Curated annotation (Swiss-Prot):
Required for proper architecture of actin filaments and for cell movements during embryogenesis. Plays a role in the radial actin fiber architecture in skin epithelial cells, thereby maintains cell geometry, size and cell interconnectivity within the skin. Plays an important role in coupling actin fibers to cell junctions in endothelial cells and is therefore required for correct endothelial cell morphology and maintenance of dorsal aorta lumen expansion during embryogenesis. This is Angiomotin-like 2a. The keyword Glycosyltransferase does not apply. Residues 172-198, 554-567 have a biased composition (Polar residues). Induction: Up-regulated by fgf17 and fgf8.
Length: 721
């Protein structure tokens, strides 16, 4: 398992690097171990066989005890300090047939040893004085505990291995035969501590025959190992486990000399020593301390040997796993070969099946072709019989079509004759249309001349209106001046002169009124002529449309001809042409009628808009009335035929009667102080004598006149609608 070996070598190399970093970097022993690890990693890098991560994980889970779930940093914080921190030194222990312990085992073992060291320090502190050697060792253990909390677990593992090597100070090589040089490091540390506590350097203490150990205390190295290996290994992660020395070791810890007052002896190990020998007491204390250290190192060595046995067992399990992996790979290779042979066999079988399928498809296609040819022959026989029957039917239809062709030929000749007749009628209608167009153009010219005449008349009327208005204003001003003058110069004796002057004034007013009425008569006669001309034009247009309509009805009436039944079946294009022409003529006549109505309405609106300032003197109430009557007569003439137009004209009231009514209204609106009574006669117009009235009567009369004129206008508008 190359990955596990590389990780083990990486852990060992980290231990060495951290020891060099936190310990003595110039130690030649550590440098030699590092170089040996590098050489061993480069020489044994190709050993081992790969295994899957699942197998290695399963093997490690089955061999490692249940440990705590907390993961300590494995020295990654020091990976960037050295370039060769990840060098391949994974086979360093493999050269000596050993492997490093796993991370969980090393962690549990370090926790156990730290707890054991703390218990030993506390026990020594209770036996010795506070200022003696035990206090110094307790301080050392406390400093080690702080350092373990500050450093990583890999540094603790390296310290553990160094302490194991220091336990055998007289043996040049440890039990693992891996790194004998590491034992000098901790021995130097012990010598330094002894030099601190004991300044003078002396040789080894002499042998004292009177200080003999008890038989229970003198245990050989193999017996101590046997005592540890006969027991089951303790749970390293348990917090309730406490390690106490065995019962035969109790006299060793309790054999310290008991100090007595001066002049008495000291009992040590069952022997009496003079109390005044100070050097002897120091040697006894040093001997006891060294014994305790040897015992602690022996225990540590036993623990390390048990850890090495556990590592050996793990390596054996790993070898077993590698063998199983090799067997599994061989089995997989065998199965792969079998599967490849099976795939080849299936390919051959598939090829045979494909060939058989192609042969079957070809046979089936041949059978289908034969069946199709048989069905096609049967269908051809049936089609031949159908064709024979169809041929007989077509021969009968051919004979029938020949007879109908002769009939169609006769009809064509009749249609040609009808076409010639229609063309002749079309030429006649075109000539008539040209004549009517010339007549329409003549009417349009007359209408334009009439419009010019009306414009000239309107200009003249406007001029006369302005002149009359100015003269009336001057007359009013002169009359007012004359009346004021007469009022100022009037006296009670001149009543007759005033009456004569008033009569003369009334006479002049009546003469002016007569002149105004004569001017109105002349103007209304002119307007009547214009309206009659417009009505005549409308009547002519309506008569033309009615005559054309009558002609169309006569031409399209049914005739008793030999080909009448045939003509009814076939619609003639000439008939459509004639209908379109008639429709065009009717629309043109309606257009002319509407033009005439529009012109009359425009004239009336212009007259109404041109005379707003004369409303007080003489409101033009008669103009809309005449225009409305003329428009109504024109509308009636346009909407009916020629006979209807004549009837409508006869039904209208006589023109002199209308003029009399209009003149009466005009005369009643011209004078503010008089109320004339107009009587319309067929031949003449009589004007009654005026009577003086008040302003209220004149206003009521004007209101009545306005209401009557508005009612007449409403009636005319309803007639037009």
């Amino acid at each position: 398992m190359r990955t596990a070996e590389e990780s083990s070598g990486t852990v060992l190399h980290r231990l060495i690097q951290e020891q060099l970093r936190y310990g003595n970097p110039t130690d030649p022993t550590l440098l030699a171990i590092q170089q040996q690890a590098l050489r061993g990693g480069s020489s044994g890098g190709g050993a081992g066989s790969p295994r899957s991560s699942l197998e290695s994980l399963t093997q490690e889970e089955s061999l490692s005890p249940q440990l705590s779930a907390r993961q300590e940093p494995q020295g990654q914080e020091h990976q960037g300090d050295f370039q060769h921190s990840e060098s391949p030194v994974c086979h360093l222990y493999q050269l000596h047939t050993e492997e490093l312990p796993t991370y969980e085992e090393a962690k549990a073992h370090s926790q156990y040893l730290a707890y054991q060291r703390g218990q030993i320090g506390l026990h020594q502190g209770s036996l010795e004085s506070p200022g003696g050697v035990g206090g110094a060792e307790q301080d050392d253990s406390m400093w080690d505990a702080k350092r373990e909390h500050a450093r990583s677990l890999s540094e603790r593992l390296l310290q553990l291995s160094l302490e194991r090597n220091c336990a055998h100070d007289n043996i040049p090589m440890s039990s693992s035969h891996s790194y004998p040089q590491l034992s000098n490091n901790h021995s130097d540390t012990v010598v330094n501590e002894q030099s601190v506590h004991q300044p003078d350097q002396r040789g080894p203490p002499p042998e004292y025959p009177f200080m003999v150990r008890s038989p229970g205390y003198m245990l050989s190295h193999s017996q101590e190992h046997g005592h540890y290996y006969n027991e089951p290994p303790p749970a390293f992660h348990s917090q309730h486990y406490r390690l106490f020395p065995t019962q035969p070791q109790a006299p060793r810890h309790n054999g310290l000399p008991t100090l007595t007052p001066a002049g008495q002896d000291v009992n040590v190990g069952g022997y009496s020593i003079p109390a005044n020998n100070f050097q002897m007491e120091q040697l006894i204390k040093e001997n006891e301390r060294l014994k305790r250290e040897v015992d602690s190192y022996s225990e540590k060595a036993a623990r390390l040997q048990k850890l090495e046995q556990e590592i050996q067992r793990i390596s054996e399990a790993y070898e077993t796993l590698m063998k199983g992996s090799a067997k599994r790979e061989a089995l997989e290779k065998t199965m792969r070969n079998k599967l490849e042979s099976e795939i080849k066999r299936l390919h051959d079988f598939n090829r045979d099946l494909r060939d058989r399928l192609e042969t079957a498809n070809k046979q089936r296609a041949a059978i289908e072709v034969e069946d199709k040819s048989r069905h096609a022959f049967a269908k051809l026989v049936e089609q031949n019989e159908d064709h024979l029957r169809e041929r007989e039917r077509l021969e009968k239809e051919t004979q029938h079509l020949r007879a109908s062709g002769e009939e169609w030929k006769r009809r064509r000749e009749a249609l040609e004759q009808a076409l010639i007749t229609a063309q002749t009628r079309n030429r006649q209608l075109e000539e008539e249309l040209r004549r009517k167009r010339a007549y329409v153009e003549k009417v349009e010219r007359m209408q334009s001349a009439l419009a010019q005449l009306q414009a000239a008349c309107e200009k003249r009327e406007a001029l006369e209106l302005r002149l009359r208005t100015r003269l009336e204003q001057e007359l009013k001003s002169l009359r007012a001046q004359q009346w004021q003058a007469q009022t100022q110069h009037a006296s009670p004796g001149s009543y007759l002169d005033l009456n004569v002057s008033s009569l003369q004034q009334q006479l002049r007013e009546r003469e002016e009124q007569v002149l105004a009425l004569e001017a109105d008569i002349t103007r209304w006669e002119q307007k009547y002529l214009e309206e009659s001309t417009m009505r005549q034009f409308a009547m002519d247009a309506a008569a033309t449309a009615a005559a054309q309509r009558d002609t169309t009805i006569i031409n399209h009436s049914p005739r008793n001809s030999p080909n009448s039944s045939f003509n009814e079946d076939l619609p003639s294009p000439n008939h459509r042409h004639q209908e379109m022409e008639n429709r065009i003529r009717a629309l043109y006549a309606q257009l002319l009628e509407k033009d005439a109505i529009i012109k009359v309405m425009q004239q009336r609106s212009r007259r109404e808009q041109g005379r707003p300032e004369l409303q007080g003197l003489r409101p033009a109430r008669s103009v809309p009335s005449i225009n409305t009557v003329a428009t109504a007569s024109t509308t009636r003439a346009k909407g009916k035929s020629l006979s209807d137009d004549q009837t409508a004209v006869a039904s209208l009231p006589p023109l002199p009667h209308l003029l009399a009514k209009i003149q009466c209204r005009d005369s009643s609106t011209q004078c503010d102080s008089e109320e004339p009574s107009c009587k319309a006669e067929p031949a003449d117009v009589a004007v009654s004598a005026p009577e003086p009235s008040t302003a209220s009567s004149s206003e009521s009369t004007s209101l009545k006149t306005t209401q009557i004129s508005s009612a007449v206008e409403n009636d005319m508008v309803e007639i037009l609608i």
